[in-house]
Amino acid sequence: TVQFNLIEGGFKGPVMPINPNQQSVSGVLAYRDIASLPVTPELAILTTSLDEAPALIQELGARGTRAVLLLSRDVLQDHRGARVALLSPDLSQKHADDGESLKQKILEAAKPYLLRIMGPDHLGYAVPSTHLNASLSCTRPLAGHIALLCQSAAVMRSVIDWATRRDIGFSHVISVGMRWDVDFGDLIDYLLRDSNTRAILMYMENTHNRRKFVSAARAAGRVKPVIVLKPRDFRAGPIEDAVYDAVFQRAGILRVNNIEQLFSTAETLATAKPVYSNRLTLLSNSYSLALLTSDTLLRHGGRLAEISEATRAQLARDCRPDYPIENPVDLGDMAGPEEYGKALDLLLQEPGTDGVFVIHAPASVDRSMDSARVVLERAKNQRLIMSCWIGEAAVEPARDLFRAAHIPTYEAPGEAVEAFMRLAQYRRNQELLIETPPSIPEGFTPDIETARRIIQIALTAGRHRLNAYEASQVLSAYEVRTVPLQFASTPEAASEIALELREPVALKILSPDIANKSEVGGVAFGLNNPLEVLVAATGMLERVSELVPNAVIDGFAVQSMQSRHNAYELMIGVRTGRRFGPVIFFGQGGTEAEVIDDVAYAL
């Protein structure tokens, strides 16, 4: 299949199949072995079993080859979900170990020659502009300016077929496979420097080298759009997916939810003028359609742009006398090219809008092509213009007119709104790319030794979580203001602290075995005197002994009550993700935090 694709694709370079048992392969002269090749191949494609690969890679590297595609498919998943080489019929831990050992042998064979390896378990890749199709795909991708990186062979085939039917072309189509060597970070870094690539699309399920990936994506995001379609891994839990969202935002990557959005976003970013906020002006010959579109815009977090009083008055005089003009701007079903032209001339000068979305519905007098030409003339303006000519055969020529001029056009208003909001999000991601943390204030001298000592004591005790008292001390060491907290080892000691404070207090039990104190009745607020504190602390010990009998009790935390009207209870902390390590989280705190789940993550 690979050789057929290479020849049928029109590749002009030499194709040298190696087969010791045949004189030719698909009509092309075959060679017995690597040593028999008349010239050194720049790219070698191995379709042999993986256990033969190390020796072949070493021979190719010694000869001067610098890239190898491992198209071997003798890989499966072991019981842990990790892909391994299948070296015998039954799949067991031994074969998983053999697979990892084989991977290391392949990488060690390539290392002395700086030879890079793609795969295994992938479809190969194609560069349509050079007629190179070194893939197992049965559909030849068209040439274009969009690069596609795909972790799934099935998704890659589907995307190529989907794009071909819509006349969408690619600069590169790359199946990444198991990424034993070349991974997403390497490929993004390469495509960043490719002048024929205007946008990078990715289907990814996970990434191995997080630092390389984020670094490459941030560099590419400054130059060209990087758009990712990543399914949510429900086995990993919602936190892991939220961390990926934070990574994508920090790297300037735009995340979409399906294949249609993947391409529509790429097309929009490649053809649309930039926006700087989420303010959109709607212009239509149908108030009902404009109203429905405004609902969609607001639901997606967009805003209707403010139109100045002077512009609204001029619109009323020029387009619809004696009719109140607001945003959405309704021109009426009799509007034609003259009304569209006057309205656009005024609206595109408004400083409070980021773009104008023109929605045209079929009317009793069909002037859709004339109106489309007027819109097309105004599209030379520096502001964004988007169009939606609703209908099928009657309006298709108008859509073709917009497409030929690279004006964003859509079949349904909702698609356009989603595209506009992704433009706004892309702009926001670009701003995040250049954000840097503020400098440390002058005169700030944290007590690092105290913080380290507290943490070391906890680690020595085999704990991975600080109690409230220790956390308060660490925060104080870094000059973070907190409500003063005092430690009490017994209920009687807690009562004595309350006597000294002479004001209502809050009481919390301290235990490394109790993460959520409220679930075991380990928190009491508004205790007015020492007796109430004594009774509450004693009751906490009794409840904990029943609910968590093996829990180690360190003592109690006593704090003055802080009551503020309409105050928010928040939480902030650090969690460790499976792939991206420590991440900061911030959100709603309190007893209902897990139920409400209003949390944001950031690197």
Please give the residue ranges for each predicted region.
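Catalytic-core regions of core metabolic enzymes
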Residues: 1-603
